[in-house]
Design a protein with these regions (language model features):
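Phosphate-binding active sites in nucleotide-utilizing proteins
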Residues: 6-101, 111
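Conserved nucleotide-binding/hydrolysis micro-motifs of P-loop NTPases
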Residues: 43-44, 115-118, 172-173
Length: 246
């Protein structure tokens, strides 16, 4: 633990998981609350966690204090009235332990989706203009990246089981009203009926999920991969060989 020297008015909500797992939808729903600002996929934390800080800060407390001050000072620059700021960079799942140790007041929402559905969605999204998504260009590397994600999240979930808001996307879409109310409650906010009109929220969305967040919840998206099952054997074999059910 670190000594909290400076407090900030803005509190972060991290929404993370595999890309195409439903992070944009959950951000859209959460940010429809009047006290939540959806900032999109921020690169603040990955930049902070650049390897150079490991040479500069050898003392764990100094390192965590640096992460805290850098991150919170950056999100405090958003000139908005809302108390909570959503950071939906999916790859922040790499840093969950550092987040919870340096920013204990942060809320972390982890979204899990059917493995084959999320892997297929990564492949069909055509992330060719996104350097950070190079793994998504081949079926084999998508499967391998999923294994990395799965192992990391297994570790964090076991270590910080009481500190994560876990959402099963495929269950969420079946009863999104009840699920949304649970999320808002877990964040520590009061429910607002306007949240159910999340698809009318005209905030800027800069991901491949624009159409989804402007529409009502679609329940069958995780079944689409089955239409292409015979072409997806490389991913299926990787998942089966590592005892991952889909």
């Amino acid at each position: 633990k670190i000594k909290i020297q400076n407090t900030y008015k803005k509190k972060p909500i991290f929404i993370l998981g595999m890309p195409r797992s439903g992070t944009s939808l959950i951000e859209q729903i959460v940010s429809t609350h009047s006290n939540v600002y959806g900032a999109g996929e921020l690169t603040i934390l990955p930049k902070i966690m650049h390897k150079s800080i490991w040479d500069k800060y050898t003392n764990p407390e100094e390192l965590l204090t640096f992460i805290r001050e850098e991150y919170l000072s950056k999100i405090s620059e958003f000139n908005v009235n809302q108390e909570f700021v959503v950071d939906k960079m999916p790859f922040n799942f790499f840093y969950i332990g550092f987040i919870l140790k340096s920013i204990p007041e942060a809320k972390i929402i982890h979204i899990h989706r059917n493995p084959m559905a999320v892997c297929w969605s990564n492949f069909k999204a055509n992330f060719f203009d996104n350097v950070g998504m190079n793994y998504a260009h081949k079926l084999e590397t998508i499967g391998e990246f999923y294994l990395i994600y799965n192992e990391i999240m297994k570790f964090w979930s076991e270590t910080y089981s009481d500190s994560l808001i876990n959402i099963d996307y495929d269950k969420f879409v079946i009863d999104y009203e009840t699920s949304s109310k649970n999320i808002i409650s877990d964040i520590g906010l009061n429910w607002e009926n306007e949240i159910l009109k999340f698809h009318e929220n005209n905030r800027v969305v800069e991901t491949n999920s624009l159409l989804q967040v402007r529409s009502k919840v679609y329940q069958d998206s995780s079944k689409n991969w089955k239409k292409y099952k015979k072409h997806l054997s490389p991913i299926m074999e990787i998942l089966k060989n590592n005892n991952i059910e889909f």
